[in-house]
């Protein structure tokens, strides 16, 4: 396989087309062409390479194109002033802002049909992962057929099917109404719609709850409304103070710590986190189910000490940048 390799020396970047092959259980890499030091000219340089590389380049087109676009927007951001952040390093901030720049300058300006197709691709990834984190056994390919063709997977419970279909409905409602204000009504409605046909206990819980396999104490039932009032107040006070990803990540953690509902807190929290991002001009993110243990560990560490928020926010940033260039390009 071939891919682009970036070598950084000081403040300068140099690009190479690199080939990787497995031989006798070992991976051998070799630089086969120097592509220059300007990411904006790399695409042209690749087109000028000898025909013997065409087949391999075509096979790796998406990987190569992803690299070029991501680094093109990263270079644009590097030339701009970025406000220092206590939770994110400059490198991580630059990667987030590169996604934001492409989101606003390219993706959101695409024609409606293209946007809807890409949003559907995102929804499939998001719905599969957010429900899988909670134990849904529907596979990605099955989720795709269910959400795009309404083909019900065999031997799956109605709960699992509703789980995905409800996520689809709520997601597109947010996409079509990004200006919705974050308040008690929106939070309750988001939860109730996500749990429709799954758990009919609506509204904030009136009973104490223990979180299965999670070692933390949620807000006692009599204080849920008071803590949710404080959370919404905190959100409103910090909306223009914190970086949107930091705001969304910290809101998510605080929400999960309160655990305001009897069930569906994780799914609701991840949906609200994406609503916060999009309402503030930032792209959406997918927390992958394969990262479940790391994700829960980061949430738990922040429970014990808010100084660990940095680890949680950096985790969210990594999930955003990875999912963005894989889906929205």
Regions found by a protein language model. Give the residues of each.
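FIC/Doc superfamily catalytic core
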Residues: 1-263, 268-329
């Amino acid at each position: 396989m071939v891919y682009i390799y970036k070598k950084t020396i000081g403040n300068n970047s140099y690009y190479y087309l690199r080939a990787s092959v497995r031989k006798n259980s070992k991976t051998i890499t070799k630089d086969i062409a120097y592509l220059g030091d300007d990411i904006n000219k790399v695409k042209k340089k690749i087109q000028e390479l000898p025909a013997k590389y065409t087949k391999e380049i075509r096979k790796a087109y998406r990987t190569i194109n992803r690299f070029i676009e991501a680094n093109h927007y990263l270079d644009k951001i590097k030339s701009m002033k970025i406000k220092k952040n206590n939770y994110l390093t400059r490198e991580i901030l630059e990667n987030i802002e590169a996604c934001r720049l492409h989101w606003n300058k390219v993706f959101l300006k695409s024609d409606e049909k293209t946007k809807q197709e890409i949003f559907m691709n995102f929804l499939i990834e998001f719905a599969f992962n957010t429900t899988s984190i909670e134990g849904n056994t529907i596979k990605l390919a099955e989720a795709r057929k269910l959400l795009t063709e309404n083909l019900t997977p065999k031997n799956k419970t109605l709960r699992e099917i509703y789980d995905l279909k409800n996520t689809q409905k709520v997601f597109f409602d947010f996409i079509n109404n990004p200006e919705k204000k974050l308040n008690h009504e929106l939070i309750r409605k988001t939860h109730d719609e996500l749990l429709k046909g799954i758990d009919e206990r609506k509204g904030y819980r009136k009973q104490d709850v223990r979180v299965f396999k999670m070692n933390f104490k949620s807000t006692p039932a009599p204080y849920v409304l008071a803590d949710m009032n404080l959370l919404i107040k905190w959100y409103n006070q910090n909306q223009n103070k914190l970086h949107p990803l930091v705001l969304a990540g910290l809101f998510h953690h605080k929400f999960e710590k309160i655990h305001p509902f009897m069930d569906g807190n994780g799914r609701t929290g991840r949906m609200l986190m994406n609503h916060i991002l999009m309402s503030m001009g930032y792209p959406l993110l997918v927390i992958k189910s394969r990262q479940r243990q790391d994700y829960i560990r980061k949430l738990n560490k922040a429970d014990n000490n808010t100084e660990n928020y940095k680890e949680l926010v950096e985790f969210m940033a990594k999930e955003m940048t990875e999912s963005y260039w894989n889906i929205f390009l």
